[in-house]
């Protein structure tokens, strides 16, 4: 379960994702679980050389500057960056979750490449920006822009880390300041693993607050609650608890709403819930039909067309592999509704991917179709299963036989592995009825902790109807309760 403020944040982020208005700002805390050090640990060996206690220091930017002043250069500082941040590491579970979402804008003060690597692992193209010249260049086919406002581990000698660099940042990196200011005005940000004592960010947030006063865009930040177990005495715990409260109130000046969590694994739970909720706005239809049972082809196609219309009306995006005898009518209804509503971009509401037919080798074809199915299902949250039969021909006798569609069975298992909500329409018969019975026989496995009301609505999908169009309200009731 999620707390009230967590639920509100999740609702808002899902809405912003649907409208392509969501962005991430990643701080050092997001990369820490991968093994990268925070600023304090990065500078600890250097503070020892300065005979200072890093645990007593709060102004780490000044500490880095002290070291440069004393050593007449930043060579040792650059070496520390190479040693600690230049080491390749794997993205964390949180990076992986974020990379699966349709987030087109990332900002970070981190030098590591975990965001870019996570995007690459998802087959997405990251357009990385960490110099002024990068801002005027656009990577072909990019999926997301990653703004690294403090530099990149590949150029450690240019990384922003000293007080001199921070003070001159608005002058030397003015295009980054302008770009971030624009995104903070037009997008809703989620700040993760971030410390708000960064002078650059403080400067930018202050400028936006002054310009927009009470009309600033709402942003979110996730903080872990100050925990007594982290402190050796009550005095330190009380002090840091009070300080966190002050920071939360101060961030409200910049329209940044802080949402507290008990432990860092709660962050993963929240991101998973956001992903699940977002994906549940995308419905996949699995099905094929060579014969249409007692309903007949005309009534079945009318129902499928109406189903496509209704899902678009309800604000869903639909995905289809254009199954034989099923997909065309379903897609036609959706397209008609999209045009009736004068939506300008069909791709925002509809994804069609026809299965490649002309692959001669059966083994290769099967592997390609499996990969195709995984790709189709990966961005959806609900899978409907309808009918599911096909015709096979005996190569010797030439006799044709109607059999259950094994492809639907594979789509069912892939969808289950990906965590989709599975809705076989048992009343349509064939493979869909078989899959319906499979779920009902082990309902708590497929729908753990579901309400009696949901199960009752689900079971109605198996009730026989004389006209398939009568299934529309039953399907709607099940989806509404998910």
Curated annotation (Swiss-Prot):
Catalytic activity: NAD(+) + H2O = ADP-D-ribose + nicotinamide + H(+)
Renumbered residue ranges of the record's region SLOG (STALD) domain: 282-482
CDD domains given in the database record: SIR2-like
SUPFAM superfamilies: DHS-like NAD/FAD-binding domain
Activity regulation (record text): In vivo probably activated by a cyclic ADP-D-ribose generated by ThsB (might be 3'cADPR).
TM ranges: none
Signal sequence, renumbered to the chain: none
Binding site for 3'cADPR: 287-288, 324, 355, 373, 390, 407, 411
Class of this enzyme: hydrolase
Keyword set includes Nucleotide-binding: yes
One of the GO BP terms on file: defense response to virus
Function field: NAD(+) hydrolyzing component (NADase) of the Thoeris antiviral defense system, composed of ThsA and ThsB (maybe J591_1492). As purified, has NADase activity that is not activated by any tested cADPR isomers; binds 3'cADPR better than 2'cADPR. It was suggested the purified protein is already in a fully active state. Upon activation binds and hydrolyzes NAD(+), leading to cell death and inhibition of phage replication.
Similarity comment text for this entry: Belongs to the soluble Thoeris ThsA family.
Protein name listed in UniProt: NAD(+) hydrolase ThsA
Gene that encodes it: thsA
